[in-house]
Amino acid sequence: MGSGPADEEHTVDTEPGVSPPRRTVGGRETVRAAVVVGALGVVFGDIGTSPIYTIQTVFNPEDPHPVPISTNNVYGVVSLIFWSVMLIVTATYVLLVMRADNDGEGGVMALITLLRRMGAVRGSRVTAVLAGLGIFGAALFFGDSMITPAISVLSAVEGLKVVEPGLEEWIVPITAVIIVALFSVQRRGTAAVGRLFGPVMIVWFVSIGACGVSGIARHPEILKALSPTYALSFFFGHFGIAFFALAAVVLAVTGAEALYADMGHFGRRAITRGWLVLVLPACVLSYLGQGALLLGDQSAVSSPFFLLAPGWARWPMVLLATAATVIASQAVITGAYSVASQAAQLGYLPRLRVAHTSESTIGQIYVPWINWVLMVSVLTLVFAFRSSAALAYAFGMAVTGTITITTLLFFYIVRTRWGTPLWLVVCGAGCLLAVDLLFLAANLTKLVHGAWLPLLIALTAFTVMTTWQRGRAIVTRARERAEGSLGDFVGQLHDYRPPLVRVPGTAVFLNRGKQTAPLAMRANVEHNRVLQQHVVIMSINTLPVPRVPDTERTEIDKLGYAEDGIVHVTAFFGYMDAPNIPDVLRLLDPAETEGPIAVDSASYFLSKIELTMGTAPTMATWRKRLFIATSYITADAAEYFGLPGERTVIMGSRIDV
């Protein structure tokens, strides 16, 4: 199976990013509020549901390194959670990392793009190594995308055993049903449901904050945990306990990467305000309230989040928590689609079939292959681990790895791209990376207890992506040598002796651009010595707009020769347009294409590469096999471009890898 025409003959013109909505004088506050509410429904679902399971996991008596419940330990853990959130989420991400954007876009892939640009300019080996580290961070995110829906929905449904212990055996089946339903509706898009996400999350944050206040009111002394002295005293006074506790404390900052990754859709200012005004206070109040509950009743450690709610509110809280965790899962699933799509555009994955589900937001996409891989993976995790506590350390490993890599890449860019003084970078990076590395080290101690899972997923994804990048570079070089210059090839057509036989009919050759000759066209000429009277060489260019009007659909180039029946057409599509080639041909002006094109009888030629195992030492044998296997998921070009199957000719060329 080849790398596929869909991967080779389709280009995407990716503009830098999606600018956040601008404020207008007349509707200044309305626009700002709408954007913040939208961010609440998409960005903060993951981090906003962390209070469900964080403290419960820290004090889990079945933990291999349990934290004993005592008054001092409760103060220390709550203080450690609070200052971890302040240092990692507020200081690292909100105040610092979110300032490093790729023309408005955020996330680890944006940092990789910046590093690749710097590497192209400077040719630095360090830049290349860090870009590779960034790819591993993106691979860790795929692991996060599998673990988040499993642990989030499980933790919410586990509230059933608090309100009705007899339902405990139904937790896993109910979770599985919710997961299947969640992934099954992805193809319909989330635009309609998404409008409800923001208001639901507002209710969620107000509710957990209110429950926290009720707990604090009963034991206001818990407010002392806001002092960093309690965190430091716990950490250094009980280092053996506190160090291992970090592996669970890090669950409080899960979703921090989402704040940065979704910056392109909502803007840094809207996300910052949503975090500081509502999300941070609500989460802190919930943690303080749960700590206060444990001060008065240590037996509540089995489920402090749900037991914090009054008895009459526990059923509604279970339902609300389930809705919130579904929203959190939706955010990370959409993030996986975006990362996969960006990885394909950067050449780390083959061209995937991407369906855009919104005309107003380019980021709302559906990638079928990724969707079903995620669903199977999430269900496997649910049935294998069966509880949120069992998944906690797998989750922590994915989070700490991504955060550490993001922080490292950020400070390298701060120094090399922004020219920040070295002493300032060393101080800032030293402090924040020390915190990140402590969390990472604590999670590494949990390798045998589940932390191996995200590393295995990340290593697998990293290997696939780097192998595809390497293999694609090998194939591209070989293909360019085989194709040759389009201008030279067209010139040679006029110099054939005896002249080429021009047979009646229209031939449409899809190609990657105007620089090289289509392999199918070259093979037809060199082997058959014939060419149709009317030849259209077409390249596809997708623009970052919903739709392109028909008046701006095409650009025609006669390639330097008039009246020879050969033209090059560049067709422009928006990301919501279905790229239908026959429809494009009907739009062409016969005066510009050297006569009318017989669309209903035209033949369409695709160049397809057959990949074979070569003897050249380009890659290890197992990587060659992996590259060839990965090529099978490339989207079918004929179907993608709307070509009639009975008049589509696929002409293959063999390339050794």
From Swiss-Prot:
Q: Which GO molecular-function terms appear in the entry?
A: potassium ion transmembrane transporter activity; symporter activity
- Write down the chemical reaction(s) this protein catalyses: K(+)(in) + H(+)(in) = K(+)(out) + H(+)(out)
Which ranges does the record mark as transmembrane? Answer: 35-55, 77-97, 127-147, 165-185, 196-216, 234-254, 275-295, 315-335, 365-385, 394-414, 422-442, 447-467
GO CC annotations, alphabetized? plasma membrane
Q: Does the keyword Membrane apply?
A: yes
Q: Which Pfam families match?
A: K_trans (PF02705), K_trans_C (PF22776)
Which keywords belong to this entry? Answer: Cell membrane, Ion transport, Membrane, Potassium, Potassium transport, Symport, Transmembrane, Transmembrane helix, Transport
Query: Is Transmembrane helix there in the keyword field?
Result: yes
Q: Which InterPro entries match?
A: K+_transporter, K_trans_C, K_trans_N, Kup
Q: Where in the cell is it found?
A: Cell membrane
Q: How does it sit in the membrane?
A: Multi-pass membrane protein
Q: Where is this region: Disordered?
A: 1-25
Q: Which protein family is it in?
A: Belongs to the HAK/KUP transporter (TC 2.A.72) family.
What function is annotated for this protein? Transport of potassium into the cell. Likely operates as a K(+):H(+) symporter.
- Protein name in the entry: Probable potassium transport system protein Kup
